[in-house]
Amino acid sequence: MLKRSKFETTQSQIMHRAEDLISAASNRYRITVQVANRAKRRRYEEFESAEDAMMKPVLRAIIEMSDELTQPEIIGEI
C-alpha cells in the first residue's frame, strides 16, 4: 500500500527541482549550504509563529529556491 503525499509535489518532482538547483549552481557545496541555511531559518520562523508545519523545511527550501531560479520575477525589486 502506497502512502500518499499531502502535497501537490511528489518526490520525483522534488528530486528534479534539486537536480536543477545543483546543475544551475557553480558550486554544489555552496548551494547545499544555502538550502540548509534557508531550511534552518524557515524552521525557526515556523517554530516562533507556532504554526503546524505540513512540509519539512528542507523540502520547502528546495521548492522555494527552485521557484526563484525558474521564475526570477518572484524575487523582484521592492
UniProtKB/Swiss-Prot annotation:
- Role this protein plays: Promotes RNA polymerase assembly. Latches the N- and C-terminal regions of the beta' subunit thereby facilitating its interaction with the beta and alpha subunits.
Q: Does the keyword Hydrolase apply?
A: no
Provide an example Pfam family for this protein: RNA_pol_Rpb6
Q: Which InterPro entries match?
A: DNA-dir_RNA_pol_omega, Pol_omega/Rpo6/RPB6, RPB6/omega-like_sf
GO MF terms, alphabetically ordered: DNA binding; DNA-directed RNA polymerase activity
SUPFAM superfamilies for this protein: RPB6/omega subunit-like
Domain of life of the organism in this record?
A: Bacteria
Which Enzyme Commission number(s) are on file for it? 2.7.7.6
EC top class, in one word? transferase
Of the GO CC terms on this record, one is:
DNA-directed RNA polymerase complex
The reply on keyword Signal is no
Q: Describe the reaction catalysed, as an equation.
A: RNA(n) + a ribonucleoside 5'-triphosphate = RNA(n+1) + diphosphate
Give the quaternary structure.
In cyanobacteria the RNAP catalytic core is composed of 2 alpha, 1 beta, 1 beta', 1 gamma and 1 omega subunit. When a sigma factor is associated with the core the holoenzyme is formed, which can initiate transcription.
Alphabetically sorted, this entry's keywords are: DNA-directed RNA polymerase, Nucleotidyltransferase, Transcription, Transferase
Q: Which GO terms describe its biological process?
A: DNA-templated transcription
What's this protein's family per the entry?
A: Belongs to the RNA polymerase subunit omega family.
Under what name is this protein listed? DNA-directed RNA polymerase subunit omega
